[in-house]
Amino acid sequence: MSEQKPQVAEQAQELNSELQARREKLAALREKGIAFPNDFRREHLSDQLHAEYGEKTNEELEALDIEVTVAGRMMTRRIMGKASFVTLQDVGGRIQLYVSRDDLPEGVYNEEFKKWDLGDILGARGKLFKTKTGELSIHCSELRLLTKALRPLPDKFHGLADQETRYRQRYLDLIANDESRNTFKVRSQVMSGIRRFMVEKGFMEVETPMMQVIPGGASARPFVTHHNALDIDMYLRIAPELYLKRLVVGGFERVFEINRNFRNEGVSPRHNPEFTMMELYMAYADYKDLIALTEELFRTLTETVLGSSVVQYGDQTFDFGKPFAKLTMKEAICKYRPETNVADLDDMDKAVAIAESLGIKVEKSWGLGRVQCEIFEETAESHLIQPTFITEYPAEVSPLARRNDDNPFITDRFEFFIGGREIGNGFSELNDAEDQAQRFADQVSAKEAGDDEAMFYDEDYVTALEHGLPPTAGLGIGIDRMVMLFTNSHTIRDVILFPAMRPVK
């Protein structure tokens, strides 16, 4: 028997003993009728107290004679005879409580407080003061147990097993990990910042169906579900695009939506099957207008959320205050694979040879545009570290984008890259109903040839275009990847509160 097995068994026995002891304490509280009170009202948060009073001296605090009311989770406790120090954690941070036997009602300190456990939720009232070491603290005159925790606080996380725990039991991660709490605060600030920016630009926030009869707006494999009342199969949406453009047809000329998309694909550090996107559509604009808007959005968000246009991500530094780089797809390929020339990329046989030399398995159904795109992804994408717009995507891989006036092989489209990963995708929208119908037909052919990610034919959307879509540009930005960048997170699971996980057997 390994040394680990007795140790694991001993730990399990200790945990069971602690759980039993905590349940017995809860039973005693139930007997007294005070198990889960709900009459304590908090008036102050720890971060607000530190911000307002943290720089004041103890003499100044005594003169102010400030009584505060706080509540939160007991994270640490140091019992020193007749007095104790407690660290209380709330949504704003942590603050220290000073608990003296003589300042509480008789019996509370020895008969109640000492029997409480780490992780319990407490309410406290008292005067602010500074300890001899200068720490802002609350001298408690009232201390109450608000919620009895039946399980102990988690240890600090480390190692693979604990990473799994962080994702599966995010509530434990948020209790124990300051960095995780900050990540999701930043995420909330990013979402709020995007909404403020969009509203200031005259956009209206809308909501479109999450379940669709025809999944559209992107090339991806959808999740399938069944609507019992209608007795039809439906799809969780892979993108809101086609519904948002229907709204532009209807006269809402600037719309945006922040919501989840679902794609039945692999899980990786950059991909989660359920993810958050912001999509916007702007009438009487083209893709160049959205390139400028994207720059302005990122510059505004970094400065308002992070307080600086400079973002540190691992060992990389991005300055969003500087103009972003711009390259065509072919320019990017030639830059990062110098032996390649544009003439070879425009020749099907030579392009296929380049792709195969890179280990790309070229499918028979692929045209030249798809081959070029695969070469780009293999040779250039990972090198696009600084904020970069890639333009001139082939029409073959851009079934919803408007063809370029001078070169119908390409579209007026861009993708936005930071740190070697795609963050956004935008283009001048295809508003030619007949061209759109043909491209849908081409997608159906690709699907019949075995391309699971090819689009469906959406006849109603073509009908909408026949009523007239104004010249329009659209943009989609991955919120999760944006938050990864802003929080220096290197896996998408760290920025999604409850990421998709394989069930524990």
From Swiss-Prot:
Binding residues for Mg(2+) 1, per the UniProt record? E415, E422
Report the subcellular localization.
Cytoplasm
| Coiled coil stretches, renumbered | none
Mention one GO biological process in which this protein takes part, according to its record. lysyl-tRNA aminoacylation
Q: SUPFAM superfamilies from the xrefs?
A: Class II aaRS and biotin synthetases, Nucleic acid-binding proteins
Q: Which cofactor does it need?
A: Mg(2+)
Q: How is the cofactor bound?
A: Binds 3 Mg(2+) ions per subunit.
> Which molecular-function annotations from GO does this UniProt entry contain?
ATP binding; lysine-tRNA ligase activity; magnesium ion binding; tRNA binding
Similarity section: Belongs to the class-II aminoacyl-tRNA synthetase family.
What name has this protein been given in UniProt? Lysine--tRNA ligase
Q: Tell me which species this is from.
A: Yersinia enterocolitica serotype O:8 / biotype 1B (strain NCTC 13174 / 8081)
Record gene name: lysS
